[in-house]
Amino acid sequence: MSYDLLLAGGDVPGVGRRDVAVHGGLIAAVAPELPRQARTVVDVTGRLVTPGLVDLHTHVGPGYWGIDPAPIAWYTGVTTWVDAGSAGAYTMAGLARGTEVRIPALLNISAVGLTGRTGESRDLANCDVDLAIETVLADRERIRGIKVRIDAETVGPNGVEPLRRGLTVAAACGIPVMVHVGTAPPAVDEVLDLLRPGDIVTHCASGIASPLGPAALAAHRRGVLFDIGHGSGGFAFDVLEAQVDAGMTPYTVSTDLHARSVYGPAFDLPTTMAKLLAVGLPLADVIAAGTVHPARALGLNAGTLDVGAPADLAVFAVEEGRFEVADAHRQTRTAPLR
């Protein structure tokens, strides 16, 4: 068989040296050695070949936090940018649809979305369950979950009520909730106790709200997915290390990339992934946390090199050494790769 594209001699994490062939926009074959019968053959010996990266928590919509993904996507290998709550029911129509990258969305339970820095769920009139359900069902292919930010500034005296409403919407539509945890009140345990298997807690190792106690362990054991969500203040090495030691390894790694984190401390998804390597997580596990795991969490057809899957690929040059990386609180560790 003749292929459209053959990536020859690359290293697939957890598998080893492989050739990857593409035909008709799909992955046609993956094997230790394939015939050099392709319209284009690219020698990627010594390079890392992965599915296109899937960033589960970004902000690419209009508003206070939003950035343009296009200038960053090409050199970071991130082909799927999940917009995590920039838009609510009032503003979803203004959220960009991907051209060069895919932009699935998590609908903010607050209909105003993230038009400002915070406070979107202080007025419960904006957390309209029926309107949110209607919005999801009208755009179900794009809207893959519900986003709720729970911290003192965002919800004010409303506590976990916005989360309860988000969970009602999610249950009605058969989708997960991603909840941002931050400064109490409400307490992080009160938030975790409400989450269902398949729901996502982002900023899981923030150092601000640190899920480390019995409620966190119980949530992790029942299938609540822990997501890094680095951002400008959402990641602390010491908290992540304690979680890993307790058996609460994060399921997904994401950047929470936005206008206040893109120039540091998060920078981009490969840089954030290197920080997981710096605490001792294996490369293959870190790659999975940035590809197949976020895709599974939202039911996306992405994140895999399986034959027949879309030919959504990334190729990385990898340098071995000792590279200092910093979290959001200026703690540093040493990563073995970049």
Put a short name on every predicted segment.
Residues 148-263:
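Active-site core of metal-dependent hydrolases
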Residues 241-318:
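His/Asp/Glu-enriched, well-ordered alpha-helical/loop segment
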Residues 310-338:
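C-terminal cap of metal-dependent C-N hydrolases
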Residues 71-151:
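Divalent-metal coordination cores built from histidine and acidic residues
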Residues 52-60, 81-83, 103-107, 144-148, ...:
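Hydrophobic faces of well-ordered beta-strands that scaffold small-molecule active sites
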Residues 10, 25, 46, 57, ...:
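Divalent metal-coordination and catalytic microenvironments
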Residues 1-50:
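Histidine-rich, glycine-flanked metal-binding segment
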Residues 36, 43-98:
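Metal-associated gating/positioning segment near the N- to mid-region
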